[in-house]
Amino acid sequence: MAASSSHLFALPSPASPFLSAPNRNRVRVLAKSCPENQSFDSNDSDSSSETTHKAQGDQKSVSRRQWMTACVCASAALISNSYTFVSVQSAAALDKKPGGSCRNCQGSGAVLCDMCGGTGKWKALNRKRAKDVYEFTECPNCYGRGKLVCPVCLGTGLPNNKGLLRRPGARELLEKMYNGRLLPDS
């Protein structure tokens, strides 16, 4: 299966002396499009240059600075269009809820436990007689999970939860949250 695309070739040709100023070097650009299966050789450029001399009144000469600027801009545009990367921020923006997200938990509905720092383990001091020993036990705040339900959005992840506490089951929801029976992401 052959792709039908064409390649553009640009050939600088000397500018006519009456079009260019004596202090400026000008270059005339001839662009020719040919398909992939057809080769581009110098014979084609000679025959096409004859046709350009016939239509010389229609063409305009371009300075080298303008030509280089156009080449740089075109190549930068082609490079930027050929590679499309999805950044982590834009991918995260696609997953967000349409109404925004909670500022405290960033829309996840859960925050790290402030007592254990998200590890789920708590350093407890065990004092026996003359020596003190630190033991790691289950965190009494998050019960070893390392996460707590966000107290601002109450686990919804939404920035505005007006009326949530007016619902009939809100009292049970708050009681579960304060006693640690309400799990994040549930």
Swiss-Prot record:
Q: Extract the SUPFAM superfamilies matched here.
A: DnaJ/Hsp40 cysteine-rich domain
Zn finger limits (CR-type): 81-162
Chain positions recorded as Zn(2+) 2 binding sites: 113, 116, 139, 142
Q: Which domain of life is it from?
A: Eukaryota
Q: Name one GO biological process term.
A: thylakoid membrane organization
Under the heading InterPro entries, the entry gives: HSP_DnaJ_Cys-rich_dom_sf (IPR036410)
**Renumbered residue ranges of the record's region Disordered:** 1-22, 35-60
Q: Which Gene3D superfamilies match?
A: Heat shock protein DnaJ, cysteine-rich domain
Q: Which UniProt keywords apply?
A: Chloroplast, Metal-binding, Plastid, Repeat, Thylakoid, Transit peptide, Zinc, Zinc-finger
What this chain does, per the record?
A: Involved in female gametophyte development. Required for embryo sac development. Nuclear genome-encoded factor required for the accumulation of photosystem I (PSI) during plant development. Required for light acclimation and chloroplast development.
The protein, known as: Protein PHOTOSYSTEM I ASSEMBLY 2, chloroplastic
